[in-house]
């Protein structure tokens, strides 16, 4: 009978980013602009790479995949968050909450894998430039991206399935703006120790594994750069990696703050702030990070604008 009583929660109430009415409209406008810039920047990057033959290289293939993932996973979160600023009480059904968690988990983990793949790509480009196109064949690139998606799916399915088996007796108030697993675990009336263990192990192994690939790749890149005699050559080699290294640092810095910690140290308010960065701000910044210091992207964008102006 106790188990039956623990099946009453069929929907959750999302508290959103703030409950202060005077801030809601301002935040709605702010995050609507951020979301619009995110979509415009990432979809624009994909289109620019597609229409520019010079950018049809492994590096930009991975960048277009990263842009697609950024656009998708911000879209999993942003619409529901924006609605929460306009209504008094924002609710989400249990099944919709589970699906949001599933898709977000797949996409954010895929992004982590893609960043490590891109580090390996930069390693091959700097250390073996003459064999770059041979080593990073189209088939190999597609396999790497496919592997990243499969890895992200396995990770997210593991947590989603274990989460769906929990019982929720109430309260049903999620102190967050989306269905993130730590904020859901504290609402369950079941034993969540296994869920916490899986979250810690999977997040830790994936983070350490992907960061190890990034670290080794950049260590070998640094050694290769030091062997370059000309200052201009060293500068060119470093500039090809600086944008990616910046993106990796921001992405893993925010995610590790949230997920690689026990529930006893979990704070909803600090987690909300950090979550804004990796769900909305980072997807917006990535196109800027990869384009502002990239001469090829800037030239391609300039040509595209000139062609558009000429056609008009």
UniProtKB/Swiss-Prot annotation:
Keywords: Cell membrane, Disulfide bond, G-protein coupled receptor, Glycoprotein, Membrane, Olfaction, Receptor, Sensory transduction, Transducer, Transmembrane, Transmembrane helix. The keyword Membrane applies. Residues 1-25, 76-99, 155-196, 259-271 are extracellular. One of its GO terms (biological process) is sensory perception of smell. Pfam families: 7tm_4. GO terms for molecular function: G protein-coupled receptor activity; olfactory receptor activity. The chain crosses the membrane at residues 26-46, 55-75, 100-120, 134-154, 197-217, 238-258, 272-292. It is a multi-pass membrane protein. PROSITE patterns: G_PROTEIN_RECEP_F1_1, G_PROTEIN_RECEP_F1_2. The keyword Protein transport does not apply. Disulfide bonds join 97-189. Potential odorant receptor. Belongs to the G-protein coupled receptor 1 family. PANTHER family: OLFACTORY RECEPTOR (PTHR48018). This is Olfactory receptor 5J3. It comes from Mus musculus.
């Amino acid at each position: 009978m106790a188990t039956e009583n623990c099946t009453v929660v069929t929907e959750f109430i999302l508290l959103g980013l703030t409950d202060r009415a005077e801030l809601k409209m301002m935040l709605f406008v702010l995050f609507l602009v951020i979301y619009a810039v995110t979509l415009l920047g990432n979809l624009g990057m994909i289109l620019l790479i597609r229409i520019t033959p010079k950018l049809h290289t492994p590096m930009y293939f991975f960048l277009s995949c990263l842009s697609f993932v950024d656009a998708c996973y911000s879209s999993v979160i942003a619409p529901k968050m924006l609605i929460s600023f306009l209504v008094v009480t924002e609710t989400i059904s249990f099944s919709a909450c589970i699906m949001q968690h599933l898709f977000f988990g797949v996409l954010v983990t895929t992004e982590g894998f893609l960043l490590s793949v891109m580090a390996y790509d930069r390693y091959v480009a700097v250390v073996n430039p003459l064999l770059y196109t041979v080593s990073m064949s189209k088939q190999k690139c597609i396999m790497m991206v496919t592997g990243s998606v499969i890895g992200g799916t396995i990770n997210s399915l593991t947590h989603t399935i274990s989460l769906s088996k929990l019982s929720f007796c109430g309260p049903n108030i999620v102190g967050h703006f989306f269905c993130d697993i730590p904020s859901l675990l504290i609402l369950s009336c079941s034993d969540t120790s296994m869920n916490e263990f899986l979250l810690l192990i999977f997040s830790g192994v994936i983070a350490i594994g992907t960061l190890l690939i990034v670290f080794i790749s950049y260590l070998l890149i640094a050694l290769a750069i030091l062997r370059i005699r000309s200052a201009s050559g060293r500068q060119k080699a470093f500039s090809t990696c600086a944008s990616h290294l910046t993106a990796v640092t921001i992405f893993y810095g925010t995610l590790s703050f949230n997920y690689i910690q026990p529930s006893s140290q979990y704070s909803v308010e600090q987690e909300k702030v950090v979550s804004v960065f990796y769900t909305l701000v980072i997807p917006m910044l990535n196109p800027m990070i990869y384009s502002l210091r990239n001469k090829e992207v800037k030239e391609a964008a300039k040509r595209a604008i000139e062609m558009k102006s000429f056609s008009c």
